[in-house]
């Protein structure tokens, strides 16, 4: 196994074990603003990931949702991009739709991606040129020929705000679940045709999933039609995203942007 991938998998498992110590237990919840909660579990997992990954690769840069950003990463060839607990709202609600997300970026490209759900024990993993796996079994993006049969994984908050209402009769099913990263893993495993978001996301939300999607034979683009180059000074990706099987992404892009 790729040594960097092995390191990322072990780190994600360690963080996941820590998170489970807090799951359905007492912990402190803070609000970072814009209804964006953070818990002591997020911080504990972040500290463990940084300790494990940066101790092993001190020359790499670091970008995490829960760490104060440093411009030092912008000069690094390789950067760890992590979200220690993607799906914090679901974690707080006791819903098992959250993951530890660990990616390694080299010259702007995600070359290692790991998503670990510590409740279900699902381990999505990929390294550039080596394929994508779910619990060591190969996975691949899949899609149906007809758009009106396709399953789209989307956001619970976007659904509540009515952003997907115009497309309710276009696709086969709009399935709203939590955690951007988890949705990318499920899509890479062929459990849905597409993951799509109509709102901006950050690099740490999607980086590991992007690697896994790529290695599962799919692609990820923003709603301007461009792939993401990672380790940017501004980490927000606007205006939204689509990922999945290549042909399904093209069809969905045309529908969501009104270019079909």
Task: Locate each region found by the language model.
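DPxDG-like acidic metal-binding loop motif
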Residues: 73-135
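Short loop/edge segments at beta-strand edges and connector loops
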Residues: 64-66, 136, 178
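Short, solvent-exposed loop/turn motifs
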Residues: 110, 138-140, 227
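An extended, acidic
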Residues: 142-260
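Residue-level signal for inorganic ion chemistry
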Residues: 19, 42, 53, 88, ...
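Short loop segments at secondary-structure junctions
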Residues: 105-109, 119, 128-131, 137, ...
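N-terminal subdomain of lithium-sensitive/metallo-dependent phosphomonoesterases centered on the IMPase/IPPase/PAP
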Residues: 1-85, 247, 257-258
